[in-house]
Amino acid sequence: MRLFPAIDLKEGKAVRLLQGRMEDATVYGEQPVEVARKFKEQGADSLHVVDLDGAFAGKPVNDAVILKLIQSSGLRVQVGGGIRTLERMEELLRLGVERVILGTVAVRTPELVEKAVQRFGEAVVIGIDAKDGLVAVQGWAEKTEIRALDLALRMKKVGVKHLVFTDISRDGMLQGPNIQSTVELARLSGLQVVASGGVSRLEDLRLLQEEAKRGVSLEGAIVGKALYTGAFSLAEALRVVGQRSEGK
């Protein structure tokens, strides 16, 4: 199972939000590049980056920082936040981003997702953020009446293979991920699902890893606040999921 330490960017700094609220942002790193380097030193090979300014403004804000993260860390980076055009996807991929995560456009303009998959293949990942099973968009500010599973199945039809699933109610709360909903979504959709939101203990990762070993299509997990607060180290987390890098 693949582990993605997370860096959320706000005004060029590494922050974490509580349940997606911009007003509840805690700064954990004035220099995101240093945060990424530390992740690399502990054995990471991947990084999950969210441009929070872009998610709320719907336009790129932190590209210079993203480029520095890629160049200085050597990590495989996936980026989400405010990506709503093919041109924007191409810009990020040219920067060296491995995968782009599409959220709002999957709901608003699904035909754009289809074009993106045709053009960029598996570099396109869908991000489904849900609360009480219903999809939220626009940086989580707006809740829809669309069920997470229904959206996942629609995306599968247009060729999407990878999905990041976030239970908003768990994000940044250190209450544990919604494993039941995540596993159910993976089983019923058949997509490769990355679990996001709420990982607080190594046991959370063990439970996800056990499901993956049983054949559930869980590609990995995103870990954020637990790393910043010292709940466990990234090296410990990597050992749990059986992903070791550089002999760590």
Curated annotation (Swiss-Prot):
Query: Which SUPFAM superfamilies does its entry note?
Result: Ribulose-phoshate binding barrel (SSF51366)
Q: What is its EC number?
A: 5.3.1.16
Q: Which residues form the active site?
A: D8 (proton acceptor), D129 (proton donor)
- What are the GO cellular component annotations? cytoplasm
Which enzyme class?
Answer: isomerase
Cellular compartment(s)? Cytoplasm
Q: What Pfam families has UniProt attached to this entry?
A: His_biosynth
Q: What is this protein called?
A: 1-(5-phosphoribosyl)-5-[(5-phosphoribosylamino)methylideneamino] imidazole-4-carboxamide isomerase
The scientific name of the source species is: Desulfitobacterium hafniense (strain Y51)
